[in-house]
Amino acid sequence: MASKEILFDTKAREKLSRGVDKLANAVKVTLGPKGRNVVIEKSFGSPVITKDGVSVAKEIELEDKFENMGAQMVKEVASKTSDIAGDGTTTATILAQAIYREGVKLVAAGRNPMAIKRGVDKAVESLVRELGNLAKPTRDQKEIAQVGTISANSDSTIGNIIAEAMSKVGKEGVITVEEAKGLETTLEVVEGMQFDRGYLSPYFVTDPEKMVCELDEPFILCNEKKISTMKDMLPVLEQVAKMQRPLVIIAEDVDGEALATLVVNKLRGALQVVAIKAPGFGERRKAMLQDIAVLTGGQVVSEDMGIKLENISVADLGTAKRVVIDKENTTIVDGAGKGDDIKARVKQIRAQIEETTSDYDREKLQERLAKLVGGVAVIHVGAATETEMKEKKDRVEDALNATRAAVEEGIVPGGGTALVRVAKVLDDIKPADDDETAGVNIIRRAIEEPLRQIASNAGFEGSIVVERVREGKDGFGFNAATGEYEDLIGVGVIDPKKVTRIALQNAASVASLLLTTECAIAEKPEPKKDMPMPGGMGGMGGMGGMY
């Protein structure tokens, strides 16, 4: 086992502090509308240019083990804020640096770090409560677009596309970001339920040019097991044929005699039919078939529920206004399911989302929820080069997360103003002793830091800007994009309250942990051994006279 190096007290905190500063200083140049870019070398491919705080933080590894520990702790602030709120990573990093920097001085001067931590926690709790009072719910599409624009570094095209996507699929709809083939950034909305399974045979297509199968007012049969023989299906097929309506069969698989018979009937024109594999696998497949059945007002043919294929009638089938199937996807538009049944199913999925601990399961449940309630929107991001594409895609994803957060918890004045505006509640805190008071004062100074940095990045004197904003009321603040002092909510400079709250809580949490650190342990770097002298080459004798 390699030997360890141990640092105590001031020396440990000094090294950690140096690491915190190195990471935070690299990240904070990106803050605000006039924030600068950071260029990151990649071991392969072109360098990445970004203004995304968490992307910068993730790239930083320091040579000194102790400094690196400090940097990694602050990196966690950025990552955690990004995971929960999706934005606000730079703000969180700046707050963590400011809290730790102020706290280290006080601990070095003999203050009790545990009491300081208690003061910090009390201050953060009060500020979070006051942020809730300051927040206003998002009223319309315009405000959602403004949040998206601010988060995408003042790119109004991105803000407007996200607002349009949200208005079309609802706040619980799925919005995904993909790379476009061209230069334009566009929005594509898939209405109804779509899943990634296509027709089992190309003979089912109704439009040979487009190679798609479009059916109007079809019956929809959901079957949990594989269908290989025809005899089980004959009763229901005869009933559907009599009514002269199309039929969509969704099953684990359809093969052999069953598939051949369906294809022959389709080609002869006896029955307009299409067979599709059910989406998903295992338990998820069962759940998705049940979703389709609820959406279309049908029953899942399942032995678990005591329903057999040979016993079903047309009454057990679902229906929809239209079903479109291509080689890879199926879209069910306007299913005929009862509103109450769909609501009950949605409630059940929401409960599962709350309970699950797996990120993957949560994502899949949210997709199912979106397919039931709204639909799916895809933002195709266009750019001229691969480097620009990566940078733009990052900004779109940030903006998308910020708008979701705004819809969830409301909006507050942007540009670092909200934290300055709620600082007055810190006067009402009753600390137990002087050390707790010091903790409250650390937060009082730290929450001004994001505004100071935004002003500094825009070429203004931070202290003067902070003083002027502190004198104002409500939404009055500094618009760094124009250099004006104005009502920020009125001109659309707004932040999601959730992003501001999460950034503050995460920053205070990690900075407090660092402050109460008394000892740091890291592996000793191994001394570099000198390269041995190369040995003489044998057999070189008798070669004199060579020049």
From Swiss-Prot:
It catalyses: ATP + H2O + a folded polypeptide = ADP + phosphate + an unfolded polypeptide. Its EC number is 5.6.1.7. One of its GO terms (cellular component) is cytoplasm. Keywords: ATP-binding, Chaperone, Cytoplasm, Isomerase, Nucleotide-binding. CDD domains: GroEL. It comes from the Bacteria. Pfam families: Cpn60_TCP1. InterPro entries: Chaperonin_Cpn60_CS (IPR018370), Cpn60/GroEL (IPR001844), Cpn60/GroEL/TCP-1 (IPR002423), GroEL-like_apical_dom_sf (IPR027409), GROEL-like_equatorial_sf (IPR027413), TCP-1-like_intermed_sf (IPR027410). Signal peptide: none annotated. ATP binds at residues 30-33, 51, 87-91, 415, 479-481, 495. One of its GO terms (molecular function) is ATP-dependent protein folding chaperone. Gene3D superfamilies: GroEL, GroEL-like equatorial domain, TCP-1-like chaperonin intermediate domain. Its main location: cytoplasm. Together with its co-chaperonin GroES, plays an essential role in assisting protein folding. The GroEL-GroES system forms a nano-cage that allows encapsulation of the non-native substrate proteins and provides a physical environment optimized to promote and accelerate protein folding. Forms a cylinder of 14 subunits composed of two heptameric rings stacked back-to-back. Interacts with the co-chaperonin GroES. This is Chaperonin GroEL. It comes from Nitratidesulfovibrio vulgaris (strain ATCC 29579 / DSM 644 / CCUG 34227 / NCIMB 8303 / VKM B-1760 / Hildenborough) (Desulfovibrio vulgaris). The gene is groEL.
